């Protein structure tokens, strides 16, 4: 562990990495509870996988942006600590697998040399900020949302208000009304808008709140048709503060923001946000966009001369994979990456290409692809030749034949049946039997290995969810077929209808049935969703019902795609959020750490951060005593109320503030984040912790 101790220039990052290393050692020594340790490592991008003894590492790449240097660094890390395979996720991250837990701190330290983080890539935190991959180059965009996504990432990274929420929190930025970043299915979704105010064009966002997929998808609500850009950060802060305080914590399946919105309603939720305004770090927060407005430059003006031999393939590639940018003479190249998987040898060659002949930028996309940006028109033939050598010129970027799929049973604990195996087979069927659909961008197929929808199956035109079906004494891998979802645009979307559950090996036939029926019966130029609505859910159920019959299964039906042995259902424990075992001593120890964090923030004159660390320490301390009493601690608001009832009203504990516990805690939203209040709140927090610690010691003695 010594090798990286003096190589990290940023002391905050160094502290993070050293803390992870220290906690790993304490965990191995049995000094940290497994569930508490899991919460810590998840917040550092370290995720358990299906195979025992190794970890998946999620590398957080805001809005998918990567430079040549960063891609080289990721490739080096993958070769050194993993197996050389890179997986692009539907949140524009990169995942690598089969990493030893002991080596994760040094892996992280290597990534930080090129400003790449693991922090909050997993766990109950603000996940990677996604954005349209065409942001900044889209001919139809009002403005580039990239600097706003970037500012959001930086502002909330390590921010105390969102370190230990009840569940993960996802945000997206769409460049245009096409809503390619899928605002309607996010906790907070933003769509770029421009509005004339006082005779001048102003930048802002349409804002959507409370969306999500999973087993119970919810369409987000529009809360602002136009939010001025300088109110973006304060608005997000308010939503996060309310979610942190009122969100469910004990029942994981009901802990996402969408369930809180459903419970209290949008108006009441926004009222709670207003109550927090006095505590905001900033009342408005102008975002500097100048770094994103620099002239696009190229390392060399030299253009290698090449000769295209197969002009038909080249023209087909240009038609389906090349996008004209709003910058005159520049184009973006879409690279279709099968299942989002590619290897470090190709990654390095690609990194060299964009450095020498591009503008040193690419973006990983929400559909698990790569978009190479800022390519001069005259270099397109050269790029085609070079990308062809890498196997990166397959046409059909963002088309029906560009299937989205999560890793499923390959590596994920929660995978029920293979998602990558069926995806490969469906792509084979489309290429060989439906070549006319290769460049069809109207339809999308998405696949998830379980109900959690990491592959976004329940918002696809045609979706598949991994399941199992019992046949006698045996289990067969199965797929639930969903139809009718999609992106409408401008914040509107559709969730797919669940139709039938079929054996996995019949997945290709279900696709044939759907496409053949559409081709045979659609009206002229009728779109798929229009056709689906016209025919209705029952029609499609009847169309597919025969495939659900399990009375005539063959031996092959009991083997999943890509396997030669009978299917075994093996589901582990999910780690998207920590399931917490509350040990009293551990909770109080964590309270001490939070008080220390509050003190450090105060000494650095970060008043707002110090106040929230103090608040977290108070809640954590109260939770410890309530847990010891067997009281519910589902929400922070519930903890505050219960502590008054159980300890203050019964005179078991007295507060230095001589108030109710609620009045003591809620000073946080009654005061602006000043030095004086931060100091007072911190001292009151220390006094409260001391009183609780004394009470507990006395209780243990008796």
Annotate each predicted stretch with a short phrase:
Residues 1-597:
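Peripheral terminal and linker regions in Fe-S/redox and tRNA-modifying enzymes
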Residues 153, 240, 515, 599, ...:
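Structural signal for well-ordered, non-membrane alpha-helices
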Residues 241, 616-627:
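Short, hydrophobic/amphipathic alpha-helical patches that form generic packing surfaces
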Residues 526, 608-612, 634:
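Short, solvent-exposed positions on alpha-helices
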Residues 579-581, 585-600, 622-702:
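Long, charged low-complexity segments
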Residues 595, 602, 607, 614-615, ...:
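Inward-facing hydrophobic residues that define packing positions of alpha-helical scaffold repeats
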Residues 606-610, 626-629:
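Charged, well-structured alpha/beta interaction segments
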């Amino acid at each position: 562990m010594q090798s990286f101790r003096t190589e990290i220039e940023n002391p905050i990052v160094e502290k993070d990495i050293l803390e992870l290393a220290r906690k790993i050692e304490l965990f191995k020594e049995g000094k940290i509870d497994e569930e508490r340790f899991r919460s810590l490592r998840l917040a550092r991008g370290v995720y358990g996988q299906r195979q025992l003894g190794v970890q998946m590492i999620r590398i957080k790449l805001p809005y998918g942006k990567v430079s040549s240097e960063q891609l080289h660094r990721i490739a080096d890390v993958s070769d050194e600590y993993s197996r050389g395979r890179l997986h692009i996720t539907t949140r524009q991250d990169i995942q690598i697998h089969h990493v030893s837990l002991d080596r994760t701190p040094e892996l992280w330290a290597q990534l930080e040399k090129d400003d790449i983080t693991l922090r909050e890539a997993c766990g109950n935190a603000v996940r990677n900020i996604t954005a349209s991959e065409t942001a900044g180059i889209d001919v139809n965009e009002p403005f580039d949302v990239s600097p706003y996504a970037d500012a959001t990432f930086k502002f909330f990274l390590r921010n105390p208000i969102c370190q230990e929420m009840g569940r993960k929190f996802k945000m997206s930025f769409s460049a245009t009304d096409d809503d390619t970043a899928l605002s309607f299915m996010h906790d907070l979704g933003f769509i770029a808008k421009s509005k004339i105010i006082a005779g001048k064009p102003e930048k802002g966002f349409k804002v959507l709140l409370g969306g999500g997929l999973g087993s119970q998808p919810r369409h987000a609500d529009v809360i602002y048709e136009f939010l001025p850009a300088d109110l973006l950060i304060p608005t997000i802060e308010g939503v996060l503060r309310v979610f942190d305080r009122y969100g469910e914590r004990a029942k994981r399946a009901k802990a996402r923001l969408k369930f809180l919105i459903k419970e209290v309603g949008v108006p009441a939720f926004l009222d709670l946000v207003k109550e927090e305004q006095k505590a905001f770090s900033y009342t408005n927060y102008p975002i500097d966009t100048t770094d994103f407005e620099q002239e696009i430059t190229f390392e060399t003006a030299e253009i290698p001369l090449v000769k295209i031999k197969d002009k038909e393939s080249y023209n087909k590639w240009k038609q389906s994979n090349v996008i004209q940018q709003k910058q005159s003479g520049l184009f973006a190249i879409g690279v279709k990456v099968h299942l989002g998987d590619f290897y470090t040898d190709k990654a390095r060659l690609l990194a060299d290409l964009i450095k020498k002949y591009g503008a040193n930028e690419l973006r990983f996309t929400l559909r698990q692809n790569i978009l190479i940006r800022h390519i001069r028109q005259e270099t397109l033939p050269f790029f085609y030749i070079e990308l062809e050598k890498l196997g990166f010129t397959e046409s059909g970027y963002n088309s029906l034949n560009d299937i989205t799929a999560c890793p499923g049973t390959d590596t994920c604990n929660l995978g029920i049946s293979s998602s990558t195996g069926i995806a490969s087979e469906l792509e084979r069927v489309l290429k060989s039997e439906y070549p006319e659909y290769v460049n069809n961008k109207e339809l999308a197929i998405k696949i998830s290995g379980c109900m959690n929808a990491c592959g976004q199956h329940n918002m696809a035109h045609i979706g598949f969810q991994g399941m199992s079906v019992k046949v006698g004494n045996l289990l067969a891998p199965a797929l639930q077929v969903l139809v009718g979802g999609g992106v409408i645009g401008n914040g509107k979307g559709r969730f797919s209808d669940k139709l039938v559950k079929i054996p996995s090996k019949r997945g290709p036939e279900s696709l044939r049935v759907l496409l053949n029926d559409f081709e045979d019966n659609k009206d002229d130029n009728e779109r798929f969703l229009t056709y689906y609505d016209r025919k209705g859910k029952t029609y499609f159920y009847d169309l597919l019902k025969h495939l659900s019959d399990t009375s005539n299964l063959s031996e092959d039906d009991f083997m999943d795609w890509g396997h030669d042995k009978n299917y075994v259902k093996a589901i582990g424990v999910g780690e998207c959020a920590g399931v917490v075992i509350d040990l009293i001593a551990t909770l109080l120890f964590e309270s001490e750490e939070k008080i220390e964090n509050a003190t450090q923030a105060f000494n650095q004159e970060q008043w707002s951060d110090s106040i929230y660390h103090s608040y977290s320490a108070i809640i954590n301390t109260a939770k410890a005593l309530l847990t010891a009493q067997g009281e519910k601690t589902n929400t922070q608001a519930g903890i505050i109320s219960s502590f008054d009832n159980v300890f203050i009203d019964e005179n078991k504990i007295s507060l230095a503030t001589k108030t109710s516990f609620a009045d003591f805690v809620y000073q946080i939203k009654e005061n602006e984040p000043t030095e004086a209040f931060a100091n007072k709140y911190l001292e009151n927090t220390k006094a409260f912790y001391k009183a609780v610690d004394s009470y507990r010691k006395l209780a243990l003695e008796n």
